[in-house]
Amino acid sequence: MANYFNTLPLREQLAQLAKCRFMDSSEFADGVEALKGKKMVVIGCGAQGLNQGLNLRDSGLDVSYALRPEAIAQKRQSWKNATENGFVVGTYEELIPTADVVLNLTPDKQHTPVVKAVMPLMKEGACLSYSHGFNIVEEGMQIREDLTVIMVAPKCPGSEVRAEYVRGFGVPTLIAVHEDNDPKGEGLALAKAYAVGTGGHKAGVLMSSFIAEVKSDLMGEQTILCGMLQTGSILCFDKMVEEGIDAGYASRLIQYGWETITEALKYGGVTNMLDRLSNPAKIKAFDLSEELKVIMRPLYNKHQDDIISGHFSQTMMEDWANDDKNLLQWRADTAETNFEKTPAGDVEISEQEFFDNGILMVAMVKAGVELAFETMTAAGIIAESAYYESLHETPLIANTIARKKLYEMNATISDTAEYGCYLYNHACVPLLADFMKDIKTDVIGKGLSVEDNGVDNARLIEVNKALRSHPVEAVGAVLRGHMADMKKIV
């Protein structure tokens, strides 16, 4: 199989990257009607598989789970997830032949063997659905011409997909139809009904393409969403301990600080996050972030270039073929970092203290969000897609670090995201070595002293204007307006 994106002429590549439209709520007036009476069979019962299935069933749809015989015989977690929630469970051979819609919600590395196994069993004219387009775009999977291929991708972890649905809301969702596989022209209707079934239409839906979803998703998760948070955690912890700050305090400040800081990001963008700082601290964070952007921009460009060219995917798939040798080694190495091995202390840290003593962390989030957004849009990805894959998902990933540090983050994200995270981290830590030499406890660990409270009015006005005028703030204000009812993470 060849990389699908690389087989397209340049003009088509650019058109697919730029495909993104925020859909009006009126476009979902038919609800789940297009899926009513259809048999939906889910393959994979992990976080996304289970929670999407629960939502679809609660929306009145017919949902069952097809699992491998060994998963059923050994009563693995996927079998437990499905059976304990009252779903019908069967083998591929038992359930796929009668399925109208097959939902492939397995991990990326399993997509090729899974699709090759189920495609011969699928009835003529059925629909195959994904929640991530890697298999189509990067692996170039060829799907039978009579099958409709769609994507419905919630922009949140599976647990949030369910939690928001139960609240009567939903999470922002991206939908797409694979243009090479829409023989009956029903792909869009099916994708819209699916998005309604999971509750996504209540939070906003982007009509996109498989290509735009994959190239933006890979970029976001490698850089700001996972790579920058891991890099920042390691560097900030080591710096604080080096400067004599109690290791338990440093560990707590970082483990729970990302979550608290990015909560402000979720509700009011980068502007609101920096507004939580005093004026002197805001200017300091702004200046640090601008310096970080200069240093890290070439690295962000490299990640985007490697994603666009397919080099990243090729390298990762070579590691798949080598039994994940690099991934597993990098995972083990992360477990041995000082931050990961140091328990959070018992000291209580107030919400505001996370901001006051975490100025550098705020700067890193700002730099990472803006760089990821700028790099994606420069590559032809539309602003709405870039927003969802940068600023929007950052609080959701930060929340996983609060639970069990970097281990939980890397366990929650996909192996694809984890692999890219490590690549970024390995390059970024040495890249920031000289920058970190000049960092002191005034920006990480202790906060600014009273003597640092002077502010130049003209400079403050300049900083505030720069914050509010960044393109990620403009598109974010519009998209967040559709998510006003989402619950607080913290």
UniProtKB/Swiss-Prot annotation:
Pfam families assigned: KARI_C, KARI_N
Residues at which NADP(+) binds: 45-48, 68, 76, 78, 108-110, 158
Entry binding sites for substrate: 414
Active site, per annotation: 132
Cellular component terms per the entry's GO annotation: cytosol
SUPFAM superfamilies for the chain: 6-phosphogluconate dehydrogenase C-terminal domain-like (SSF48179), NAD(P)-binding Rossmann-fold domains (SSF51735)
GO biological process, one term: isoleucine biosynthetic process
Cofactor: Mg(2+)
Entry-linked InterPro entries: 6-PGluconate_DH-like_C_sf, 6PGD_dom2, KARI, KARI_C, KARI_N, NAD(P)-bd_dom_sf
Domain KARI N-terminal Rossmann: 18-208
Assigned keywords, A-Z: Amino-acid biosynthesis, Branched-chain amino acid biosynthesis, Magnesium, Metal-binding, NADP, Oxidoreductase, Repeat
Task of the protein: Involved in the biosynthesis of branched-chain amino acids (BCAA). Catalyzes an alkyl-migration followed by a ketol-acid reduction of (S)-2-acetolactate (S2AL) to yield (R)-2,3-dihydroxy-isovalerate. In the isomerase reaction, S2AL is rearranged via a Mg-dependent methyl migration to produce 3-hydroxy-3-methyl-2-ketobutyrate (HMKB). In the reductase reaction, this 2-ketoacid undergoes a metal-dependent reduction by NADPH to yield (R)-2,3-dihydroxy-isovalerate.
Reaction catalysed by this enzyme: (2R)-2,3-dihydroxy-3-methylbutanoate + NADP(+) = (2S)-2-acetolactate + NADPH + H(+); (2R,3R)-2,3-dihydroxy-3-methylpentanoate + NADP(+) = (S)-2-ethyl-2-hydroxy-3-oxobutanoate + NADPH + H(+)
Protein residues bound to Mg(2+) 2: 217, 389, 393
Gene assigned in the entry: ilvC
GO MF annotation, one: magnesium ion binding
Pathway assigned to this chain's UniProt record: Amino-acid biosynthesis; L-isoleucine biosynthesis; L-isoleucine from 2-oxobutanoate: step 2/4; Amino-acid biosynthesis; L-valine biosynthesis; L-valine from pyruvate: step 2/4
Name of the featured protein: Ketol-acid reductoisomerase (NADP(+))
Domain KARI C-terminal knotted, first and last residues per copy: 209-344, 345-486
Similarity section: Belongs to the ketol-acid reductoisomerase family.
Binding-site list for Mg(2+) 1: 217, 221
